[in-house]
Amino acid sequence: MEGAGETTTSEGHLTSAAAFVEGGIQDACDDACSICLESFCESDPSTLTSCKHEYHLQCILEWCQRSSQCPMCWQSISLKDPTSQELLEAVEQERNFRFNPTRNATIFRHPTLGDFELQHLPVGVDNAEIEERIIQHLAAAAAMGRARHGVRREGHRSRSSSQGHQQFMVFSSQPNASSPPPHPPMPSSPSQRDESDTVSNLPHNALGEGSHQSNTQPPTSSHPRQVSPSASDSNSRPLNQSSPSEQDRAGPSELQSFSESLKSRLNAVSTRYKESISKNTRNWKDRLFSRNTSMADLGSEVKREVSAGIATVSRMMERLETRENSRPSTASVSDVSENHTPETNNEHNRAAAGDEHSVNERGVKETCATGSGSS
């Protein structure tokens, strides 16, 4: 039974939403928004209108981009919360600008966010009105971005890109300029934080004309919305530069201090790089010169070692040659000595025979002498 009750309730909500989209007057939902059919919560509370209907702030702001009447009773929409009413008025102004296009466009130059094109401004508008208009633009965009990317929209529904519409008419006059990041990095030192706060809080005073259009993002939104340019202002027009006196009004002392600090930092970095480069070149020169001297010393030592090695090798070769030459000479000497030994024996025998012959001759002579003496 409970499931059937929930089914009938959801079907009733869907039927109410379908009839509401078609334009019929329906009863308001008790605890849910009659536009998106989602319940109210602490992160996304309800916003009460003057006709006592409750909606999500984002839903009613998106509805007011198309219509100025309450979707439930078709009365003129006004919110009881003064802050929400200011946002609603800003959205209605943007809707009127889109429905009633004009050719007047004013260029606003911000030192941090770049150049912005503000359309539909009077000719004799002063700087205070320009600042108020810009604050309204950025506040409306921030509220829409936060509500669109809130917790209640995660995983519940997805809208096609064909149903998207323009949110606010703030365009950049520089097509190639990059938009500021949604989450700027926090400076590390207090001085850098002061400088960034000073630059972001400068007044918005510079004026000009032109209509180059590109997507830009508000810095105050944690989830910024992209802006689609209008087709009526697609033709380019010349850009008139503002006078120097009007540009000097945007905090000259802060700009000068910021530029001087940047120049000092750049000079310090450049001197550091120059010193490091000079040190590196000196080290390389010292290394090259030391390598040349060491190579010269090494060459002399190598030459000495090579000459000593050549001398030792030549000596060894000479020794080997002398040894090889001495071996055949000793062999010939031994052969000659062996050949001469029998000759010496023969000579010895001959000498012994000669001695015997001489002894025999002496004996014969003595006998002959004795014989002659006896006769």
UniProtKB/Swiss-Prot annotation:
SUPFAM superfamilies: RING/U-box. The keyword Metal-binding applies. Residues 146-159 have a biased composition (Basic residues). It catalyses: S-ubiquitinyl-[E2 ubiquitin-conjugating enzyme]-L-cysteine + [acceptor protein]-L-lysine = [E2 ubiquitin-conjugating enzyme]-L-cysteine + N(6)-ubiquitinyl-[acceptor protein]-L-lysine. Pfam families: zf-RING_2. GO terms for biological process: megagametogenesis; microgametogenesis; protein ubiquitination; proteolysis involved in protein catabolic process; regulation of cell cycle. Keywords: Metal-binding, Transferase, Ubl conjugation pathway, Zinc, Zinc-finger. It comes from Arabidopsis thaliana (Mouse-ear cress). A zinc finger (RING-type) spans 33-74. Residues 178-188 have a biased composition (Pro residues). GO terms for molecular function: transferase activity; zinc ion binding. This is E3 ubiquitin-protein ligase RHF2A.
